[in-house]
Amino acid sequence: MIPGEIIVAEGDITLNADRDAITLNVANLGDRPIQVGSHYHFAETNAALSFDRAATLGRRLDIAAGTAVRFEPGQTREVALVPFAGAREVFGFSGAVMGKLDKD
């Protein structure tokens, strides 16, 4: 075994199975590339990204953990988003939520 090596069973691996995924188009209106990580609260991404932010509240990219999506200047791409799971509390990022996503 190599340090850090991951050995997986044969067959397909399904990420975020049975999650309520949505897709939407996102455009980078800025003049610099923007990279968004797998677990970043998508509603709080860089303001140069243009999309329906309200629809993304409490969601993250539907990609493998530790990976990211890069938006080049002027690029529009379709992304899939899934809801945060677990306690559904968001802290940090741009500070827009700082607590529970779901109101009791």
UniProtKB/Swiss-Prot annotation:
GO terms for molecular function: urease activity. It is found in: Cytoplasm. Its EC number is 3.5.1.5. Keywords: Cytoplasm, Hydrolase. Its main location: cytoplasm. It holds the Pfam family Urease_beta. SUPFAM superfamilies: Urease, beta-subunit. It is an enzyme of class 3 (hydrolase). Pathway: Nitrogen metabolism; urea degradation; CO(2) and NH(3) from urea (urease route): step 1/1. Heterotrimer of UreA (gamma), UreB (beta) and UreC (alpha) subunits. Three heterotrimers associate to form the active enzyme. Belongs to the urease beta subunit family. This is Urease subunit beta. It comes from Methylocella silvestris (strain DSM 15510 / CIP 108128 / LMG 27833 / NCIMB 13906 / BL2).
